[in-house]
Amino acid sequence: MSTLRIATRKSPLALWQAEHVAQQLKQHYPELTVELVPIVTQGDILAHTPLSKIGGKNLFIKELEIAMQQNAADIAVHSMKDVGVTLPEGFVLAAILPRENPFDALVSNHYAHLNELPNGARVGTCSLRRKMQLAHYRPDLKLIDIRGNVHTRLQKLDSGAFDALILACAGLIRLQQNARIRQILPAEISLPAIGQGAIGVECRADSPFLAHIQTLNHFETAVCVQTERVVNQRLQGDCQVPIAVFATLSGKTMTLQSRIGTIDGQRMLAHQEICALEDAEKAGARCAEALIQQGAQDILHEYRK
């Protein structure tokens, strides 16, 4: 009987995602033994420093890939929004699972709507993407960095350190914290991050479990997320850049929305593509080129300094 080892971060959300993948695999392959290999990553160790200042979200990924390289694990489970624009040589994204609610949520103990927040309200978020869009929509808000897992952030809110938080709906739903969601922010206000709400499974290209993992792939989610990633690849963006890209499918038609700007919200570029499904990758490239024509490279250059 084969044993498949899943490398995962130790946070409650990461463990939930790894367990979810394990359950899906067991449904498809009842004879398979699945074990979790929890790993502390640099992103977890540096839990109080904004990601944009310490090298971006790849800090959540690197140690999991090392575990696979050293044969301490067979696959790794990630939040797709944490996965960098390129994978190390010899690794593949074998599956992307069905997307949970991809939008951002307002979480507050006193206010039910973003528009109800008073001038100068303290809003916790560490995401440059969220800061860009919130500052553009409500420049009066005081946007404050917050790190830590979902429960840690909720505790900080409950202690009175913040008037509201902006968190991913998907994480709250998966951790059964749905009741904390006061408002789901529409795309007009806060366009989601690339891959937000989707779980990805990475493995070595020569893994004996590659075919097992590929059975979990959800085509519609995968094509949307991969198209979002094309935009970022063409722009050569990463976690340290305020960028939002979101693709949706309606039948065989894809709508691809994108934004890039400055975290003060004073400059925000946007572009939308509507295309046939088979044209998705080209649409991603066109989207990136349109943003570049508007001046995206100037913004990217500022954040790479």
Curated annotation (Swiss-Prot):
EC number: 2.5.1.61
Cellular component aspect of the GO annotation: cytoplasm
Major enzyme class: transferase
Disulphide linkage map: none
Keywords of this entry: Porphyrin biosynthesis, Transferase
Modified residues (S-(dipyrrolylmethanemethyl)cysteine): 239
InterPro entries: HemC, Porphobilin_deaminase_cofac_BS, Porphobilin_deaminase_N, Porphobilinogen_deaminase_C, Porphobilinogen_deaminase_C_sf
Function: Tetrapolymerization of the monopyrrole PBG into the hydroxymethylbilane pre-uroporphyrinogen in several discrete steps.
Protein family membership: Belongs to the HMBS family.
HAMAP family per record: Porphobil_deam
Family matches, as NCBIfam families: hemC
Record text on subunit structure and interactions: Monomer.
Miscellaneous: The porphobilinogen subunits are added to the dipyrromethane group.
Name the record gives this protein: Porphobilinogen deaminase
The organism's taxonomic lineage, starting at the top: Bacteria, Pseudomonadati, Pseudomonadota, Gammaproteobacteria, Cardiobacteriales
Gene transcribed to yield this protein: hemC
